[in-house]
């Protein structure tokens, strides 16, 4: 999927919502545990209930890998279901990979060729040669950690080195890499006060923004400082939507929560565009 196609989906749906798929067998409704593949059945119901309100789904691979080969098969069934039934939806493998070049090449092949995700999250700590293998894939997107939503982000990401915070150096440096047009960036919603500075460095890039909902980030603040002239945001919400209910009405309640976010987004889009 191209960024232009993603932008068109955002305008059509008046939504830049991304729903995180973080299936936890201890939290999903009990009646699903009796099915052959509870994780897939849970994801499928959430997807069917919210697909018209969201432009993206972000399976967090840890929540699948934790269940071994069965979990990985559930991930494959989930991405296949999205691609076959809702091909206009942008898909993100939230895997946070990043290793030496030949290893990153295999990670990229796994997520872009075998699983056929539109994008994957990566950690840039090992530098250019750990990220560029992902960037080589046409119309695939590498979403690089820039400034994350967790408290530990301040341990390293905002450290001042050579007169500039580390996260700013990461952003500036990544712009010089081959195929950098395929980069997007993770910026946490709980760091809204940093968005203005980030937009000065990467004014045109899409930002994946976790931290809305259960983590307490403000959508209005994120949009005030982070939105560009093509919107340029994918705002993720997971727990507040997918775990809105533990009953048989879980998918219906998930839709209600997703609709609340989408309606707020529609108001913002209508006021700005």
From Swiss-Prot:
Enzyme Commission identifier(s): 4.1.1.23
Pathway named in the protein's UniProt entry: Pyrimidine metabolism; UMP biosynthesis via de novo pathway; UMP from orotate: step 2/2
Active site: 96 (proton donor)
Keyword vocabulary terms for this entry: Decarboxylase, Lyase, Pyrimidine biosynthesis
A single BP term in Gene Ontology: 'de novo' UMP biosynthetic process
Keyword S-adenosyl-L-methionine: no
GO MF annotation list: orotidine-5'-phosphate decarboxylase activity
First-level EC class: lyase
Keyword Cytoplasm: no
Pfam families named among the record's database cross-references: OMPdecase
SMART domains linked: OMPdecase
UniProt superkingdom: Bacteria
Disulfide-linked positions: none
Catalysed transformations (reactions): orotidine 5'-phosphate + H(+) = UMP + CO2
Family as reported in the entry's similarity comment: Belongs to the OMP decarboxylase family. Type 2 subfamily.
PANTHER family: OROTIDINE 5'-PHOSPHATE DECARBOXYLASE
Protein's UniProt name: Orotidine 5'-phosphate decarboxylase
Gene label: pyrF
